[in-house]
Curated annotation (Swiss-Prot):
The lineage of its organism: Bacteria, Bacillati, Bacillota, Bacilli, Lactobacillales. GO terms for cellular component: plasma membrane. The chain crosses the membrane at residues 19-39, 49-69, 86-106, 112-132, 174-194, 204-224, 235-255. This is Phosphatidylglycerol--prolipoprotein diacylglyceryl transferase. Pfam families: LGT. It comes from the Bacteria.
Amino acid sequence: MSLALNPVAFNLGPFQVKWYGILMATGVLVATLMAINEGKKRHIMPDDFIDFLLWAVPIGFIGARIYYVVFEWGYFSQHPDQIIAIWNGGIAIYGGLIAGLIVLLIFCHQRMLPPFLMLDIIAPGVMAAQVIARWGNFMNQEAHGAKTTLSFLESLHLPHFIIQQMYINGSYYQPTYLYESTLNLIGLILILSLRHRKHLFKRGEIFLSYVIWYSAVRFFVEGMRTDSLYIANTIRVSQALSLILFFGAIILWIYRRKVVKPKWYLAGSGLKYPYNRD
């Protein structure tokens, strides 16, 4: 029996509420709650994470859209009216992450908060949000890999509804969203299980662990996708950026250990909680 999964969850008058949006919102909520909970242990107030979120989410979406438009400029230069039509699709996670990082650095400077500690606290939640939001691609039947066979998908022992959803226009496709979501879930479990061990992570290293893990996963998965953004029609943008981030994070980790010598992550912010900025 065919299981047709509708990307639209429900309608509000003339507006469609899609599962992709619901899953993204759920991911943001989970990330926020995780950051607030961990932040209390590291002596960072919940209000700081909520205030950061109010800036980071909208600017992150703008960054994700700008990133996509820049690398699809051949199309958007001919259809400038579509540049702001984000409701038609077209955002890129790396653009959102870059924009969010810029917001965080400015926010930490204004609030006098340690940026690497904030990154450490926020990174696992971001990873959890990515695990959840990738299922929006599943509901939309997008961001998939190349054509494959029913027998291959069955050999992965996938639930029938996943296999059925990968049947698009008469062919089966690789569920790359599932590969990325699963691998990120493994990375998230590892980070969460290790981050509270004494004398393991110094400040900034949980964030760098996330960068190393995600960039490796994205490089692998991006090579399988059929909707990649390209540079000069030859180089996959996300693979190139993943390589830069992977090696850049390793170099920064070594540099900070040998030269900067940061505090241990478990030492927290050093601020008296709850603190007063007046």
